[in-house]
Swiss-Prot record:
Comp. bias intervals (Low complexity): 125-147, 290-303, 491-505, 523-533
Gene name, Swiss-Prot/TrEMBL: TMEM200C
PANTHER family for the chain: AGAP005329-PA, TRANSMEMBRANE PROTEIN 200C
Native organism: Homo sapiens (Human)
Name the UniProt record assigns to this protein: Transmembrane protein 200C
Region (Disordered): 12-37, 80-147, 284-315, 347-368, 384-598
Amino acid sequence: MIATGGLLRISARKQDPLRPPSQIPKRKRKAKKRRKNDVVVVKGKLKLCSISGLIALCGILVLLVGIAMAVVGYWPKATGTNREGGKQLPPAGSSHRVPTTANSSSSGSKNRSRSHPRAPGGVNSSSAGAPRSTPPARAASPSSSSTSVGFFFRIFSGYLHSDKLKVFGPLIMGIGIFLFICANAVLHENRDKKTKIINLRDLYSTVIDVHSLRAKDLAAAAAAAAAAAASSSSSAPAAAPPGAIPLNGFLSYVQSRGLELKPGGCGGSGDAFGAAAMLAKGSWPPHPAAPSGGRPRGAASPPDLASSPRCPREPPSLAEAVYSVYRERSGVAGSRRAAAATAAAAASSCSSPAPCSPPESWGRQSTASSFVDSSLSAFALLPLQGGRDRGGDAEGASCSWQRPPGERGSQEIPRGELDLSMTNLRGAEGSMRGARREPEEPEGAVAARAARGQGGRLPRTGRYAALRRRSTSGLPDYRAPPSPEPPPSPGSADPDSSPLAKAASPSPPLRLEGSPPTRRDSGSSQSDDPSSSNKGYTPLREAGTSTESVLDAVAGQTRDSAVAAPVLGAEQSSPEGASQEPPTAEQPQPVQRQFTNKEKLIMISRSHAIGVEEELESTGI
């Protein structure tokens, strides 16, 4: 039954066309090969120069000796007569004497047969006798010449066909074979001990672990290099204010998020963490120098990176923008407490050196921080940074960025537009109510100052772009009070300050260095301002008046040009590049004209820069 069942299975496999029998072993072989590929075998070498190798050699020699003994014992024999002659005669001469007798008998028979037909038989007998004596002479000559060969032959001929050799020859052969086999086994065992089997999976895991460790080491080295670059590029920090941000957590967050920080440090390191190093400057050393007012500044802010020749002008990174806003929020509390103390000093402060000057020219509040709403509009998408208030001393705008020179409005824009915190605007209303108010500044002064800002064409200032953003936003200025300004002192005018600061022209208590930007309700500002009933539009007295509208007014009225000329001359006479210290007051001008809403919209639509320049040249400003 078993045999028939096997035959039936074999026949079924042969008749099955779907699964040929050759595919199954192929799959098994492939699987085995894959398994073998997962393992690498490193074999050792046989050490023949060892005890086991010597024993194997001895076994081979013993095997050869046994083979020789067996050959001598089992040497074949010719006939039975040779056996009898071999037993009676000595072993040395038996082999030579037997053929000689045979030769003599044969020769004798031949001679006898020849002597009968022929008469002279003596000659034949004598000739036949000569050969009888010749064979012994020939046999003696080779034995004397080859003594060595005869010696070995005599030894083996004595044991030839010996029964002892027939027994001990194969026995010695077996001993030699046994020794060789044992020594060979020991040699291979020693080789197998040194053979290593390496699993490729373990090898791969080891390599991956090594690479991961190297990656961690490289990351640690990069972090150490970044810390070293930050420490080398940053100056010796002073005591940090109470509201300072913890920089370690911020820097680690920036690095973990993978923000692409551009080199912001002026130390020339060029490292990718240069901006992080600049952010690490939480506090700056106090500067001993004092302005012309006589009050030494408590703390200094970082230099103007955009105006410095060592640093390229570029847009700020996300980290710098966030950090600037946070510092502005943290410094507002200290600036409120120092508002009353710095009022007199701000009123008596004079102009300082250029934007690249030492830290005493960094202590003004950003003039663009008053119109936060306009900076957040669609026309002010560029992130800016403003002054930073620390320990009761406000720090000026430190970095300004510039567009390519081919674009329109390629001047710098103050950083204070983004730094102003919306939450701090509500808290500043209390300090704003206590400030003294001044009468409204006429529109002529605003027009003159705006025309002067466009005519002077001072570098590194975003006058035109800022005015465009301010005018198109359509939001009123909540910082300027409806009170007139006192006449400015001769040394208080700053030629390099932004025309926004000159146009806004708040009262001295509102332009204090340590005072935060304040906000008033639109209803109150419009109720106090007789010319502010324009349905939400910014009146011409404020800094948001568009440049085109001002220039149109100047072109249409000759009195505007006459008023703006001395102001422009005063600005050009002062050295260019002075510090951005805000002017305390402006000369009030007579009210010229009030524009309707329709006229304002028409004037705002005229925004081309080339037309502005042509109007400036035509009016002679």
